[in-house]
Amino acid sequence: MMKKIDVKILDPRVGQQFPLPTYATSGSAGLDLRACLDDAVELAPGATTLVPTGLAIHIADPSLAAVMLPRSGLGHKHGIVLGNLVGLIDSDYQGQLMVSIWNRGQDSFTIEPGERIAQMVFVPVVQAEFNLVEAFDATERGEGGFGHSGRK
């Protein structure tokens, strides 16, 4: 299913010098977001920085949200992940997409202008209404959590 989402280009290099986000394959779930930087940024081990994408989106549909996720290769090979682990973009947000990047690796990492730094996935949203109760109906699991089912 394809859905149209309003996007605003905030930096004229996006779509020219830096490609617009696209799906790499027909089966891709995520769109790659790029670093819209003037110069390379050196990120020391343990450091975080906010990187602009040069884009703003307005999802508008309250049954959708977007999540920003790390790129698997950056995390596995270089220890580069999102500073907030997952970024949530609500349907009514209209500001620039900024990516919080954390270097959890042992070496400095350089973020180059135009580099693919994160991916964005659109997800369905269900807003819940709480029903206050005194007790729950019993289930097999009950209150068991955090490893209650073992490792094997």
Swiss-Prot record:
Protein name (record): Deoxyuridine 5'-triphosphate nucleotidohydrolase
GO BP: dUMP biosynthetic process; dUTP catabolic process
Its job: This enzyme is involved in nucleotide metabolism: it produces dUMP, the immediate precursor of thymidine nucleotides and it decreases the intracellular concentration of dUTP so that uracil cannot be incorporated into DNA.
Cofactor(s) annotated in UniProt: Mg(2+)
Database matches in InterPro entries: dUTPase, dUTPase-like, dUTPase-like_sf, dUTPase_trimeric
Sequence positions that bind substrate: 71-73, 84, 88-90, 98
Top-tier EC class: hydrolase
Pfam families, A to Z: dUTPase (PF00692)
Pathway the protein contributes to: Pyrimidine metabolism; dUMP biosynthesis; dUMP from dCTP (dUTP route): step 2/2
Catalytic activity: dUTP + H2O = dUMP + diphosphate + H(+)
Domain of life the protein comes from: Bacteria
GO molecular function annotations of the record: dUTP diphosphatase activity; magnesium ion binding
Keywords: Hydrolase, Magnesium, Metal-binding, Nucleotide metabolism
Similarity comment: Belongs to the dUTPase family.
EC number: 3.6.1.23
Name of the coding gene: dut
